[in-house]
């Protein structure tokens, strides 16, 4: 399968997820890209559970989840860890480097195929780079950015880009919601 390209259909996926409130007996529900049809999706990959930069990104998105919901967007985090690792991390307090209180699910790309399809898999390490993809309600990839493993992503920038995409217009450099769009 070709790598994900902006302006084309996002690579399909089906993965097991851990949801807030799951137990070891209830975790592992499957979710597919088609489950998000009709909504915007912020799909992001991160290297590993129980690491250092990852919880700062994951909790920053979670703390502003309502803002994404107001924009008609869902969030799905993905790593190559198991759903059981995700669940254990979700049940770990934030002060202990956990992500307790998470507002959205984490998916398990245990086969690493989804990270490969989106072009973020570090093959020799079996982990994903910090890739973030915004997929529109029709399943078309509209935005992608991939960061170095050491650099966390900006929730402000993710929200700004989502809002810019939703205008359908030409947004100049440093555009912010409420500012003028370019006219042709």
Describe the function of each predicted region.
Residues 1-184:
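Chalcogenol-based redox active-site neighborhoods
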């Amino acid at each position: 399968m070709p790598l994900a390209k902006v302006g084309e259909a996002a690579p399909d996926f089906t993965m097991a997820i851990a949801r807030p409130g799951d137990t070891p007996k209830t975790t592992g529900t499957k979710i597919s890209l088609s489950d998000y049809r009709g909504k915007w999706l912020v799909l992001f990959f991160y290297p590993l559970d129980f690491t250092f930069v990852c919880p700062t990104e994951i909790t920053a998105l979670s703390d502003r989840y309502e803002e994404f919901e107001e924009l008609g967007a869902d969030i799905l985090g993905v790593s190559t860890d198991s759903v059981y690792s995700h669940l254990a991390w979700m049940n770990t307090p934030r002060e202990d480097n956990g992500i307790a209180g998470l507002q959205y699910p984490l998916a398990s790309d245990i086969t690493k195929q989804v990270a490969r399809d989106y072009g973020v898999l570090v093959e020799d390490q079996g982990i994903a780079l910090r890739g973030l993809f915004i997929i529109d309600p029709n399943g078309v990839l509209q935005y992608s950015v991939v960061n170095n493993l050491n650099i966390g992503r900006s929730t402000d920038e993710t929200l700004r880009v989502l809002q810019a995409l939703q205008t359908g217009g030409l947004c100049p450099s440093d555009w912010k919601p409420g500012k003028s769009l370019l006219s042709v």
